[in-house]
Amino acid sequence: MANSASSRKRARQAVKRNKHNSQIRAKVRTFIKKVTYALEAGNKEQAQNCFTIMQKMLDQAVNKGLIHKNQAARKKSRLNSQIKAL
């Protein structure tokens, strides 16, 4: 348990940031799933639309330090190659 006022404030801020960051990560995962489901259904247009949104969200997550830049690049590259293969 936090004792000083500053440590209590830090604990509150950590909870708030954790909630916000987990929401952003969940949105990114949701759009990755949307692209994957569109690929499985063979719907190239929907996959392409979701992919552009997903790219933007991944880049924002990288800039905020939630996802490593190499991980984001890997996800974008693999999904883009699957879209091109359709």
From Swiss-Prot:
Name of the featured protein: Small ribosomal subunit protein bS20
Phylogenetic lineage: Bacteria, Pseudomonadati, Pseudomonadota, Gammaproteobacteria, Candidatus Pseudothioglobaceae
Molecular functions (GO terms): small ribosomal subunit rRNA binding; structural constituent of ribosome
Keyword terms: Ribonucleoprotein, Ribosomal protein, RNA-binding, rRNA-binding
Keyword RNA-binding: yes
Start-end of Basic residues biased regions: 7-25
InterPro entries: Ribosomal_bS20, Ribosomal_bS20_sf
Organism: Vesicomyosocius okutanii subsp. Calyptogena okutanii (strain HA)
Region (Disordered): 1-25
Statement: the UniProt record of this protein carries the keyword Ribonucleoprotein: yes
Role description: Binds directly to 16S ribosomal RNA.
UniProt GO BP: translation
